[in-house]
Amino acid sequence: MMFLPTDYCCRLSDQEYMELVFENGQILAKGQRSNVSLHNQRTKSIMDLYEAEYNEDFMKSIIHGGGGAITNLGDTQVVPQSHVAAAHETNMLESNKHVDDSETLKASSSKRMMVDYHNRKKIKFIPPDEQSVVADRSFKLGFDTSSVGFTEDSEGSMYLSSSLDDESDDARPQVPARTRKALVKRKRNAEAYNSPERNQRNDINKKMRTLQNLLPNSHKDDNESMLDEAINYMTNLQLQVQMMTMGNRFVTPSMMMPLGPNYSQMGLAMGVGMQMGEQQFLPAHVLGAGLPGINDSADMLRFLNHPGLMPMQNSAPFIPTENCSPQSVPPSCAAFPNQIPNPNSLSNLDGATLHKKSRKTNR
């Protein structure tokens, strides 16, 4: 049986007694008189009893507030308190006979209120266990270390943190101390792993700068374009070397002129039967047969016009004379054919000198 607090108990006179009954899920208080039959039995809910007690106190305050009497305009008449209470109880009995749905709702709500009140009494304080205390302590320690002002980064240096960082708009969540140590350790491992890769990238950049300095007229910034230009330049150099070796095969030793590149060019042109006044190169179909990557005259012309190649100088046309053969021409005669003396001019000079000598002897 659930006992009600004394605050909710109504005040009964000496001729009445009250009985608590649990009916239809509700706690009801039945007040009965000893000299009243069962037909006059009163059944009230807790809310009704509370309202009755409140109304009774209110009426008492009105009665006793004016000196214990109610004054009328005509004559003064004192109303005993027992008569007022009896009249009020009569009205309550008549009103309880017409119980509607609203009173039932009030009773159910009062029941829930009482049950909640007793449940709050039964709630016991359970102290936290050791694991929760340790977790809470570590979490608070992380907050305390982060708000001290000094924070250790991955390099081992210390920097002063300001309170403005915590009060910024995008406030970052605080990381506990254990998690921060794990992150710092992981970052150091990543830096140690990336140091060989960084050194390798630095070496590659140095070599690419050296290659850019070797290439003529190279102003490329990206590595891919610079490598393409280096490949083209090396291919043209290889073709030039192959052309020079093929040219030396076609020239015979008897037709080679000593002392100077102009003689080898002249001998090369003479050995293949070309004229001296024309361009002193082998035909495209002859050179292209021994050079890879050159299949037609257009490729040959593009190769000869490459800016990285040294152009071959054209020598002056060679005019053979009667007394000067290719095998017995001195170097001065071959290098400067315009300075070769003419036989007619030599005979005229000899005659002039002989005439002068004869005049001197005659004197």
Swiss-Prot record:
The protein's role, per its UniProt record: Transcription factor.
Ranges annotated as biased composition (Polar residues): 340-350
Gene name as annotated: PIF6
Tissues in which the UniProt entry reports expression: Mainly expressed in fruits and flowers and, to a lower extent, in leaves, stems, seedlings and roots.
GO molecular function, a single term: DNA binding
Basic residues composition-biased segments: 178-188, 354-363
Cellular component aspect of the GO annotation: nucleus
CDD domains reported for this sequence: bHLH_AtPIF_like
Keywords recorded for this protein, A-Z: DNA-binding, Nucleus, Transcription, Transcription regulation
Single GO BP term: response to abscisic acid
Protein name: Transcription factor PIF6
Region Disordered, annotated ranges: 154-204, 340-363
Induction details: Up-regulated by abscisic acid (ABA) and salt (NaCl).
PROSITE patterns given in the database record: BHLH
Signal peptide as annotated in the record: none
Every bHLH domain range: 188-237
PANTHER family linked to this entry: TRANSCRIPTION FACTOR PIF3
